[in-house]
Amino acid sequence: CMDSSGAMRTGWVRLADGWHYFASNGAQIGGWLKDGGDWYYLDPNTGVMRTEPLELGGRHYEFNASGAWRGYEAPAGYLQPTDHITGLGGDTNTLTWGMNGVKVRIVQQRLGLWHATKLASVDAAFVSAVTNFQRRAGLSPTGVVDRATWDAMDTGYPWTVDQYQATPLPLTATRHERIEALIGYAWNQTGSSYTWGGAGPYDLGFDCSGLVLQSLYAAGLDPQPITVIKHGWPDYRTSQELYAYPYFQHVPLAARQRGDLIFYRSGGIVTHVSIYLGDDMIVHTDWMGRPARMDHITASYGWANITPDVVRPLP
């Protein structure tokens, strides 16, 4: 294949019938090609890159519009995997009344309010301690931790520390690999401390749904509009949002499988979520002073308080 000057063309070349790939010696490539971490399929006869589904060797393959092989595609109507979790831009939580999460914990630690069973929530003691700090630092004594107050505290953490998001798998990952990544992320957090409204990383702790949300990210699932920032809001309950998320499959509890999300109710309202491992075991984190860990599926709630259906994020 030559360009208009007569020079040999190599790499990806777009011709009238589609994209082709030429080796360094000018030979046209056919069959499977790995480029930049992604796999592509080029018709062995024509050399044209495939974007339509392919049946080959008794296996079904799906491709993105870019031609990259997609190792798993959810059934129609369900959340599809992604290789990039939606960016948060400048979104981060200013610590006003009722706000929760890792930034609250960091300030509590900085001001001597934190202990293992302390709720990481902006309360009266928090506001009082912050107001006193602001007076000492020559700042306006609002009791609200904004960027200026945060910087003056010199916590060692960036103002956007609550933007942490787990890194997803590439699109080539299979369903099995995604299920194991979901479980594996949560498993790797066992031993981390509990932080109300927390979504990691390990040294800053998680609550139940913060752990599950990051595990979903690791598996390549981004259930927008749920985000780690909203997770810290006073009246936002990520466990309830995940249970009600319209693009997740629900199946009966009796049909539970490894990688499903188990939900629990208190007074008829969803208040807890865990990840199912199989054999009636889960991985979760549930309250202050108790680290992320493996546990029995009932998780002190009892069978009667488990919802009758589970969420299968990877159907």
Segments and roles (model prediction):
Residues 1-86:
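Extracellular adhesion/carbohydrate-binding repeat motifs centered on closely spaced tryptophans
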Residues 14, 34, 106, 125-128, ...:
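Residue-level recognition of short, solvent-exposed, well-ordered loop/turn junctions
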Residues 53, 94-155, 228, 276:
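Short acidic, glycine/serine/threonine-rich helix-capping segments at coil-helix boundaries
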Residues 72-120, 164-177:
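Acidic, Ser/Thr/Pro/Gly-enriched interdomain connector segments
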Residues 109, 128-140, 147-151, 155-170, ...:
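Cysteine-nucleophile amide-bond enzymes
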Residues 158-224, 267-272, 283-285:
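N-terminal capping segments
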Residues 193-258, 303-306:
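Catalytic cysteine-centered active-site loop
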Residues 234-235, 241-252, 265-315:
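Aromatic- and glycine-rich peptidoglycan recognition patches
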